[in-house]
Amino acid sequence: MRFSDNLAKILDKYENLGNKLSSGIMGDEFVKASKEYAELEDVVAKIKEYNKAKSELEEANNFKLEVGLDNATLEMIEDEIHTLENSLPKLERAVKIALLPKDDADSKSAIIEVRAGSGGEEAALFAAVLFNMYQRYAELKGWRFEILAISDTGIGGYKEASASIKGKDVFSKLKFESGVHRVQRVPETESQGRIHTSAATVAVLPEAEEVDIQIEDKDLRIDTYRASGAGGQHVNTTDSAVRITHIPTGITVALQDEKSQHKNKAKALKILRARIYEEERRKKEQERADSRRGQVGSGDRSERIRTYNFPQGRVSDHRINLTLYKIDEVVKNGQLDEFVEALIADDEAKKLLGIYSKNTA
């Protein structure tokens, strides 16, 4: 089917859905039609803009052929034709991107987990820096950042930390943060001024609701124990800490941040549900990605994705070869949008290339 025919079908479907909604349908039929109609609004707006530019270009070319036009009018028409010819490829690409299959999880909130990697205490300090960076970014975006658990080292570092980030399309913005982040800087304890390299890993999971993942009580093993602080000392005398294991998958979550066992259990279940949902997503995505290497969801988190070089004041994303020389704005102020938008654009380009290659093979 030709591209233009496909667009015409979408416009017809949108119009039919609009007529259907105006006809007085009710109940589940109305809910289903409303959802479909809303999902098409963005792509329909882009199709109409694209078709309008095509129509205007055709009219301008026809007008140019008319006899008796003066030079000033011809020059004006040629300028318009030049402008329209330049805009059409961009408008067509915008339509194609809008038509790309959507990740069902993109609209969801997210759970972010940061863990210290290689590098000892310096890695733990860097993990804390990353965690705070994401908190600043969430504040800039107007999202709600709720700390779920922090395992600190006692001197400002985090062995691991997790948070729930609630808002519209959070996962679509943060999903490319998953991977190994590397830092290069001179530790405060380094007397010789030598640069040390350490790392932390970030995992971003779509926050799953109960409707997304049904967890049976019989599939859970719940252990309780006394919470411990830094150095292993017990910080309270009740069994408030909780460890929940999902028996079918072997996924385990342990939480001890709250003094209440009930609160620890609720938070642990939230993280567990997200991890199970992400595991199922990755399996399905892997099946789809077998024929398009390099797509999000390939399951490879071992690759270093970004380096934060403090002496040079730069942050480099190795996946898209983007380097920004404003490390304080990124790390301290959470200004991540340049990376986020570039990564989204790169992902869209790869998907378009995959579809094009598939259709022309």
UniProtKB/Swiss-Prot annotation:
Organism: Rickettsia massiliae (strain Mtu5)
Subcellular location as annotated: Cytoplasm
SUPFAM superfamilies cross-referenced by the UniProt entry: Release factor (SSF75620)
Residues covered by region (Disordered): 280-307
Residue(s) carrying N5-methylglutamine: 233
Major localization class: cytoplasm
Composition bias, Basic and acidic residues: 280-293
GO CC field: cytoplasm
The keyword Zinc is annotated on this UniProt entry: no
Heme among keywords: no
UniProt keywords, alphabetically: Cytoplasm, Methylation, Protein biosynthesis
Role, per record: Peptide chain release factor 1 directs the termination of translation in response to the peptide chain termination codons UAG and UAA.
PTMs per UniProt: Methylated by PrmC. Methylation increases the termination efficiency of RF1.
Family: Belongs to the prokaryotic/mitochondrial release factor family.
Family matches, as SMART domains: PCRF (SM00937)
Molecular function terms, GO-annotated: translation release factor activity, codon specific
Protein's name according to its UniProt entry: Peptide chain release factor 1
